Amino acid sequence: MIIAVHSYKGGTGKTLISLNLAALFAKMGKRVCLIDLDLRAPSLCTTFGKRNRFWVNDYLSKACTIENVLTDCSSNIALKGKLCVGLANPSIEAIREMTAKDRKWEMEALGRLVSLRRVLMEDLHFDYVFFDTSPGLQYSSINAVITADLALVVTTTDEAESEGTRLMIRDLYDLFAKKTAIIINKIDSECLSAMSRRDGLIKIGSRQWPIVGALPCFCDILEDEGRCIYTVEKPNHPFSLMLQEMAKKLEKLQPATSHGLCQIS
């Protein structure tokens, strides 16, 4: 299954959740691939600290194959399964170049992503692929959502962000009949208690969308600045335990097949 982890605004914890879910599934024995598609603000390189000859940017620009981009990090993290990571180029020059890309390039990049899902799922036999996308309605994030089987939307309780998220799901995800699940992050304790009494659904427009996770704000995680993979290094941390429950819910959303361009309502 390909999961695009998306948000309406930056700063929701999208990358942290992408990273820890990917590592958790690999820890469970799955073959997992994590791709940094936040080309305008890449951050996974902070965790993995690798200098690559080829980046995701190069793959999307047809300068290399995806095999040239992926790095197997399984042995470094001691996982039961496999975790391969594709990093975006964090240099200022590369970020400026991505920001200047026109619509024609973005359309060609969509074709590369469609080809990528076939290679990752059919040729390289990954069980799960996580796209850590750019926030908002950038072409690159829309491309990732279109290509994925599931859009996993990370939001907070901020009123403006919640409203923007609702509009994004209603106007974009519904357009592509995209299967969607929601994570609400950085919730204060009072709201979290109220959330636990709900039925696990949120209404947007005329449809009900599943909430697969409700996470409080953890100050110690903020202080780590992405250096720790909690689900592997601190499996008993409350954040890790909550993601374990979240992973069970995501497994149940697995489509019947992930080898076509699935768009499931």
Regions found by a protein language model. Give the residues of each.
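Well-ordered beta-strand positions
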Residues: 128, 150-153, 181, 211-213
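Walker A/P-loop NTP-binding active-site region of P-loop NTPases
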Residues: 2-69, 127-128
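P-loop/Walker-type NTP enzyme "switch/lid" segment
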Residues: 39-121, 223-226
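Conserved nucleotide-binding/hydrolysis micro-motifs of P-loop NTPases
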Residues: 39-40, 90-93, 136, 158-160, ...
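Conserved C-terminal guanine-recognition region of P-loop GTPase G domains, centered on the G4
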Residues: 165-177
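Beta-strand-loop-alpha "switch" segments that mediate conformational coupling across diverse proteins
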Residues: 186-189, 198-232, 243
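Inter-motif core of Ras-like GTPase G domains
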Residues: 124, 138-159
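NTP-binding/hydrolysis catalytic cores, primarily Walker-type P-loop NTPases
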Residues: 105-110, 226-265
